[in-house]
From Swiss-Prot:
Molecular function (Gene Ontology), one example: 4 iron, 4 sulfur cluster binding
Organism: Chlorobium limicola (strain DSM 245 / NBRC 103803 / 6330)
This protein's UniProt keywords: 4Fe-4S, Cytoplasm, Iron, Iron-sulfur, Metal-binding, S-adenosyl-L-methionine, Transferase, tRNA processing
Name listed for the protein in its UniProt record: tRNA-2-methylthio-N(6)-dimethylallyladenosine synthase
EC number from the UniProt entry: 2.8.4.3
PROSITE patterns according to UniProt: MTTASE_N, MTTASE_RADICAL, RADICAL_SAM, TRAM
Pfam families: Radical_SAM (PF04055), TRAM (PF01938), UPF0004 (PF00919)
SMART domains: Elp3 (SM00729)
Binding site for [4Fe-4S] cluster 2: C157, C161, C164
Cofactor(s) needed by this chain: [4Fe-4S] cluster
Record's catalysed reaction(s): N(6)-dimethylallyladenosine(37) in tRNA + (sulfur carrier)-SH + AH2 + 2 S-adenosyl-L-methionine = 2-methylsulfanyl-N(6)-dimethylallyladenosine(37) in tRNA + (sulfur carrier)-H + 5'-deoxyadenosine + L-methionine + A + S-adenosyl-L-homocysteine + 2 H(+)
GO cellular component, one term: cytosol
Entry function: Catalyzes the methylthiolation of N6-(dimethylallyl)adenosine (i(6)A), leading to the formation of 2-methylthio-N6-(dimethylallyl)adenosine (ms(2)i(6)A) at position 37 in tRNAs that read codons beginning with uridine.
InterPro entries in alphabetical order: Elp3/MiaA/NifB-like_rSAM, Methylthiotransferase, Methylthiotransferase_CS, Methylthiotransferase_N, Methylthiotransferase_N_sf, MiaB_methiolase, rSAM, rSAM_horseshoe
Length: 442
């Protein structure tokens, strides 16, 4: 199949923000006359939209570029680009490490991609500048499906957590205009979107410079703008989790009863070393408030094992917090040095790798047990499920999520993706609820 120089293919790695950014990239290129290819085999431009949060991110990119290299051998005119956080983080050295790459674009430079692609046709090109004002306001993402949508409300991060590269890859915080967010939400709801997730590195620090609106006010307005649409948001920083935000979540019925609230460690000493800006008692108090005001709320978190200077006692405090809070789920990793971060510059990576791995395994084992038990406790209940797709295992079954973000699989019957279905839970696996459509759907 011949490759079309005006067709592009985007392979997205990493977080929801990257998925939203891929939609922005596609929209900007389509405005310039490019078309999105249905497969990488027909595209004249292949872009990898990348994430730099974990150490293995570059390894994943390297593996995929080996795959792309075969395409390039057969078609030397094929253009290969890296966008997103890895180009911003590793910069022009990537041209040396990966000769197959033709162009690099950082997260603030997507508006000039058509120019960059034209330059790359003549030789390697890069745009890696930070733009403290860029929010891509006015760009409507190109979306491949209409049931769920990500809506970025801010970009960048001002929190200098010691382990994190995000401030170095996405720059300082800037918030999308209040009215623009509401316009996008309204358009999505009118098009039939059933669930909208508001995105930001730290949504809790949202601030609209014109109206003075904070995140709780924005969230309330969004939920009223799309009252028949489920509303989620991620990610929240514990230090900025306000009482007013909790009250908004409790008072609006279409805001999902799920919160991702990364804690990273159960030790106040480690939180201070991580520069998290709060202690563990503050975190506990916020969990208590959430459970008091939103009974049945589902909680998830992030946990890092083996950060610089972590002792056995610090690790045990993390396990203790997990047993106390009983998170529904967690993203769990062991610490890896990210060059340029505060930890890399000022702290020795002094926990042996085998100890990191052992501690991580203890965290994973404990969380898996808690998650499985919480799912078993749901057996016999009736939950409301937004159907997202057919089950991967069988077209006779459907898969969806509860407001608490639990995955549910049930027999299809008369239902279709996009339906909101009341499901009687009859069983569970380690990560999934199993059920059947309830007889009473009202």
């Amino acid at each position: 199949m011949p490759r079309d120089r005006r067709k592009f293919y985007i392979h997205t790695f990493g977080c929801q923000m990257n998925q939203a950014d891929s939609g922005i990239i596609a929209a900007l290129l389509e405005q310039d006359g490019y078309q999105q290819a249905s497969s990488e085999e027909e595209a004249g431009i292949i872009m990898l939209n990348t994430c730099a949060v974990r150490e293995n991110a570059v390894e994943r990119i390297a593996h995929y570029l080996q795959h792309v290299k075969g395409f390039k051998r057969k078609c030397p005119e094929l253009l290969v680009g890296l966008t997103g956080c890895i180009p911003q983080y590793r910069r022009e050295e990537l041209f040396t490490v990966f000769p197959v790459i033709d162009f690099l674009a950082g997260p603030d430079t997507y508006r000039v991609l058509p120019v960059l692609i034209a330059e790359a046709g003549k030789g390697r090109a890069a745009r890696l500048d930070f733009n403290p004002f860029e929010t891509y306001d006015g760009v409507t993402q190109a979306r491949t499906q209409s049931l769920t949508a990500f809506v970025p409300i801010m970009r960048g991060c001002n929190n200098m957590c010691a382990f994190c590269v995000v401030p170095f890859t996405r720059g300082r915080e800037r918030s999308h205009p209040f009215g623009s967010v509401l316009d996008e939400v309204r358009a999505l709801a009118e098009s039939g979107c059933r669930e909208i997730t508001l995105l930001g590195q730290n949504v809790n620090s949202y601030h609209d410079s014109q109206s003075g609106a904070d995140f709780s006010r924005l969230l309330d307005a969004v939920s009223r703008e799309a009252p028949e649409t489920r509303i989620r948001f991620t990610t929240s920083h514990p230090k900025d989790m306000s009482h007013s935000l909790v009250e908004t979540m409790a008072s609006r019925p279409n805001i999902c009863n799920h919160l991702h609230l990364p804690v990273q460690s159960g030790s106040t000493r480690m939180l201070a070393r991580m520069n998290r800006g709060h202690d563990i008692e503050d975190y506990r108090n916020k969990i208590e408030l959430l459970r008091e005001r939103i009974p049945g709320i589902s909680l998830s978190t992030d946990l890092i094992a083996g950060f610089c200077g972590e002792s056995d006692a610090d690790h045990c405090q993390t396990l203790e917090l997990m047993r106390e809070v009983r998170f529904d789920s967690a993203f769990m990793f062991y610490y890896s040095v990210r060059p340029g971060t505060l930890a890399a510059r000022t702290m020795p990576d002094d926990v042996p790798e085998e100890v990191k791995k052992q501690r991580l395994q203890e965290i994973i084992d404990l969380q898996n047990g808690i998650s499985a038990e919480l799912l078993r406790l749901a057996i016999g209940s009736v939950v409301e499920v937004l159907v997202e797709s057919e089950s991967r295992r069988s077209s006779d079954q459907l898969m969806g999520r509860t407001g608490g973000n639990r995955v549910v699989v049930f027999d299809r019957g008369i239902h279709q993706p996009g339906d909101m279905v009341r499901v009687m839970i009859t069983g569970s696996t380690s990560a999934t609820l199993i059920g059947r459509a309830a007889e009473n759907q009202h």
